[in-house]
């Protein structure tokens, strides 16, 4: 997983034909008489997200803002809770347990949709798409969808989501924080103190998670109770860092974590 930019999450081709159980490319209109060579659709600079982030985002058609940063194409991973075929599209309901399911519409021509079998309810899929809000309800316009063959993809998506949105936060802070002149010694002292404090918090959070005997791992609620002198924000920042670095991983939900050691 690269930390150099969002392009590392995307840059894949979505030019394959559509079928019920394989990678699928959306086609809004069919050409009945003349077949033309259509350019390949490229999915680049894809930002991994969870459903809650999409539903709480600010829409600026055809892009949207997450944490104040304009984002175009996104990916989500979740389980199909519903699949309905309409006259020219298939509507999936994708649930990743972070919010209510989001509708993801995959468009076809009227003739082609008759030949396509929707993916099965209950399977885990990865969806690449663009957020839309045509009637006031946010939904995804699917660019590509495929069934997860390895559940490690689910874990990788969670880690990429955490990393990507930490980068979004940093980008937002870098554009809003005013530059205040300080002496080099003040910069060094402040940096050393901040770094030491962050390391202490991370070490304490990791120790408590590592010592937890429960199968589901340590919850954020339990960490808050044991580290009552720390803010919730500081604890969650430590958890985000430890997750990205691979020291801990989420278990039953995004509130419980276990040590990877």
UniProtKB/Swiss-Prot annotation:
Protein localization: Nucleus
Keyword set includes Nucleus: yes
GO biological process assignments: DNA damage checkpoint signaling; DNA repair; DNA replication; DNA replication initiation; double-strand break repair via homologous recombination; nucleotide-excision repair
InterPro entries per record: NA-bd_OB-fold, RFA2-like, Rfa2/RPA32, RPA_C, WH-like_DNA-bd_sf, WH_DNA-bd_sf
Compositional bias of kind Low complexity: 177-187
Pfam families named in the record: RPA_C (PF08784)
Tissue specificity as recorded in UniProt: Preferentially expressed in placental and colon mucosa. Widely expressed at intermediate or lower levels.
UniProt DNA-binding region: 74-148
Main function: As part of the alternative replication protein A complex, aRPA, binds single-stranded DNA and probably plays a role in DNA repair. Compared to the RPA2-containing, canonical RPA complex, may not support chromosomal DNA replication and cell cycle progression through S-phase. The aRPA may not promote efficient priming by DNA polymerase alpha but could support DNA polymerase delta synthesis in the presence of PCNA and replication factor C (RFC), the dual incision/excision reaction of nucleotide excision repair and RAD51-dependent strand exchange.
Record protein name field: Replication protein A 30 kDa subunit
Taxon lineage: Eukaryota, Metazoa, Chordata, Craniata, Vertebrata
């Amino acid at each position: 997983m690269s930390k150099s930019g969002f392009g590392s999450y995307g840059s894949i081709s979505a030019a394959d034909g559509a079928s019920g159980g394989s990678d699928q490319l959306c086609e809004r209109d069919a050409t009945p008489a003349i077949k033309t060579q259509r350019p390949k659709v490229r999915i680049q600079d894809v930002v991994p997200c969870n459903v809650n982030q999409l539903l709480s985002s600010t829409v600026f058609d055809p892009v949207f803002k997450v944490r104040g940063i304009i984002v175009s194409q996104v990916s989500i991973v979740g389980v199909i809770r519903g699949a309905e075929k309409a006259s020219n599209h298939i509507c999936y309901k994708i649930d990743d347990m972070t919010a209510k399911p989001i509708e993801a519409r995959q468009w076809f021509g009227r003739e082609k949709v008759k030949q396509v079998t929707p993916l099965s309810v209950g399977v885990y899929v990865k969806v690449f798409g663009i957020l839309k809000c045509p009637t006031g309800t946010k939904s995804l316009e699917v660019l590509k969808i495929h069934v997860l063959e390895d559940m490690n993809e689910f874990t990788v998506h969670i880690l990429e989501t955490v990393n990507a949105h930490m980068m979004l936060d940093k980008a937002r802070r870098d554009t809003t924080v005013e530059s205040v002149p300080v002496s080099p010694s003040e910069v060094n002292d402040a940096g050393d103190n901040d770094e030491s404090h962050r390391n202490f918090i991370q070490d304490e959070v990791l120790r408590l998670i590592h010592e937890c005997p429960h199968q589901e791992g340590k919850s954020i609620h339990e960490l808050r109770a044991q580290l009552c002198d720390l803010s919730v924000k500081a604890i969650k920042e430590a958890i985000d860092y430890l997750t990205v670095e691979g020291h801990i991983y989420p278990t039953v939900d995004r509130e419980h974590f276990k040590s990877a050691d």
